[in-house]
UniProtKB/Swiss-Prot annotation:
Compartments (UniProt record): Cytoplasm
Protein name: Fructose-1,6-bisphosphatase class 1
A molecular function GO annotation: fructose 1,6-bisphosphate 1-phosphatase activity
Domain of life: Bacteria
pH dependence comment: Optimum pH is 9. Activities at pH 8.0 and 9.5 were approx 67% and 85%, respectively, of that at pH 9.0.
Chain's role: Catalyzes only the formation of fructose 6-phosphate by hydrolysis of fructose 1,6-bisphosphate.
Pfam families: FBPase (PF00316), FBPase_C (PF18913)
Pathways per UniProt: Carbohydrate biosynthesis; Calvin cycle
Gene: fbp
Subunit structure: Homotetramer.
Length: 344
């Protein structure tokens, strides 16, 4: 009996180690069609970008030009970190010759990067935040990368990328990479949320958890309370209520990926409200809020801008910003109720 149990354990371990990103995508799509193979290859390329960024981060204090600022200001009006530039270039380099995408849109670029005509051109667009929470790099805290995959809706001859201005429910895949104690890649193609861990000995992302489900509620709220007096009253009302409730904890790291991953695993809610300084919100809709909302809903949670689901919000611009309330369904509902009650 003991030998049988040991054998079954070894079989499960081998099955897990053999479930790589590309294999998992093909299993999810239940197809070996050219489109399915392209999506599997695309996800594998995202994994390659993650490995390169993870390697650079692990040597951040030992190599030149990894820490600190470049002295430039990006399209968002934010000071550019050296690792922002590196991570953005990694994604471009990984996909330029891949034949999988026609363009890439990033937080770090005012306009999308179009694959040159002398390179193979694919049918997909990758939208991404190359290094979320990059202010954490210099103090060795968690950071991440966020991505979303969309089909090209029509031929973009004018290079205005207007077909990208579609609600988040048009995404065909979304996910993030968390660079921390281990490197995790979390993704969904509309069939649940799945977690992969980078195994350094194999050099591969292997499946760690399938079909993650967000608890209906949790006892964690994640928000930068330093902005308390800049928020609309409904958010302040919610925080006051959390302070009164026993057992609730505030956790905030400054990286959306890290904070959302905690919520995904343990339940609760992440908030990034609009403020007096940023009346339309701070997070970017297309490559931060919408990908995370896609994951939250696939895991049984919710994501809202305070008035409507994030995935139903119609973007008007590539770098459009929005408020974000995301996490366990009951907790998001409660925040929305606080906002509704505060409206005169």
């Amino acid at each position: 009996m003991a030998q049988s149990t040991t054998s079954e354990t070894h079989t499960r371990d081998l099955d897990r180690d053999c479930t790589t990103l590309s294999r998992h995508v093909l299993e999810q799509l239940q197809s070996f069609s050219p489109e399915a193979q392209d999506l599997a290859a695309l996800m594998q390329r995202i994994g390659l970008a993650a490995k390169l960024i993870a390697r650079r981060l692990s040597h951040a204090g030992l190599v030149d030009d990894a820490l600190g600022f470049t002295g430039e200001i990006n399209v968002q009006g934010e000071a550019v970190k050296r690792m922002d530039v590196y991570a953005n270039q990694v994604f471009i380099s990984v996909f330029r010759q891949s034949g999988l995408v026609c363009r890439l849109a990033s937080e770090e670029m005012e306009k999308p990067y179009y694959i040159p005509e002398n390179c193979p051109i694919g049918r997909y667009t990758l939208l991404y935040d190359p290094l979320d929470g990059s202010a954490n790099v210099d103090v060795d805290l968690n950071v991440g990368s966020i991505f979303a995959v969309r089909r090209q809706e029509f031929y973009d001859e004018s290079h205005e990328a207007k077909d990208l201005l579609q609600p988040g429910d048009r995404q065909i895949a979304a996910g993030y990479v968390l660079y921390g104690a281990s490197t995790l890649l979390v993704y969904s193609m509309g069939q649940g949320v799945h977690v992969f861990v980078l195994d350094p000995s194999l050099g591969e992302f292997v499946l760690a958890q399938s079909d993650i489900q967000l608890p209906n509620s949790g006892q964690i709220y994640s928000v930068n309370e330093g902005n308390f007096w800049q928020w609309p009253e409904g958010y302040r009302q919610y925080i006051r209520e959390m302070h009164r409730r026993e057992g609730y904890s505030g956790r905030y790291s400054g990286a959306l990926v890290a904070d959302f991953h905690r919520i995904l695993m343990q339940g609760g809610v992440f908030l990034y409200p609009e403020t007096v300084k940023n009346p339309t919100g701070k997070l970017r809709l297309l490559y931060e809020a919408a990908p995370m909302a896609f994951l939250a809903e696939q895991a049984g949670g919710k994501a809202s801008d305070g008035q409507k689901p994030i995935l139903l919000r119609q973007p008007q611009a590539l770098h459009e910003r929005c408020p974000l309330i995301i996490g366990s369904a009951a907790d998001v509902d409660f925040v929305e109720a606080c906002l509704a009650e505060s409206v005169p």
